[in-house]
Amino acid sequence: MKQVKKRNGSIADFEERKITEAMRKAFEATYIPTSDEKLQEMTATVVAQIETNFPTTTPSVEHVQDYVEMILMKEGYLTVAKHYIVYRYEHTKIREKMQEEVLEKIEENALKIKTRSGREVAFSEDSVRKNLMRFVKGYENDVDVEYILSQLKYEVYEGMTTDEVHKALTMVVRSMIERDPAYSKVAAKLLLHRIYGDVFGPDYKSDNLVEEHARVFARNINRLVEEGNLDTRMSEFDLDKLGRALVIENDHFFEYMGLEIMSSRYCMEDPKAKLTLETPQMLWMRIAMGLAIAEKPADRERVALEFYDVLSNFYST
């Protein structure tokens, strides 16, 4: 099980350790001893039950908590299960109260978020709507912008950064992909914007992407060669020529899940800053160069471009 559906319908990564910690706290609160081994065993049982009953769909947080209750009772820990049930009820009330307060602040234009510079500004639904419409362009008849905004309100909180708001917006749109394929395209656009922000800086200009791609692509290849992470022959390619051959528009061929998998698993990342270092087209070209590296030096760029054309246009899928 890799994902779970949150209470507002958005999708989040499933974290098994949270089940273990929730049960541990319930045992500690009732002063009933247990062991790490027993907690791990019960956690594994909960996960197995969920995977059996949700083979093709995503379980909700409530489903996960229901199975925790059942396992605790089945194991005979009735006092612990009772505490866990009360805990769930009390925290539901707390969440509802907090959500009410956030919604009131939004209505009063009093909810503060932080810009990249650290400056506090009021969260503006109108500003988010205007920004979102840039990504919805072309799918206006298929995407419910007002519903997305209504769900986003349950994700924002006091002191949230503008980057976190963008990520939350992406997650809300992602959770709606099952409604219409258009949501996958919009979510991919939102994710692509974050990737570009990581690679080129948060203030990148969309009308300068060709130049920026060429510059950063050459820098990345040379850096990897210098660090010993790439074959030295990679720096012998005409990097400026290959960088300028990148077809930026092909980034929009991606659906959300494909782009998310590529960016999180295969694109280079700065381990310290936790920032993505290359765009999808840069990755395709880097792979194409690797495939062409054994060619005669005079043929390498030509062959690399041929491989890139196949990869970038999804001809091989």
Model-derived features: where do they sit?
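Extended catalytic cores of very large enzyme megasubunits
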Residues: 1-317
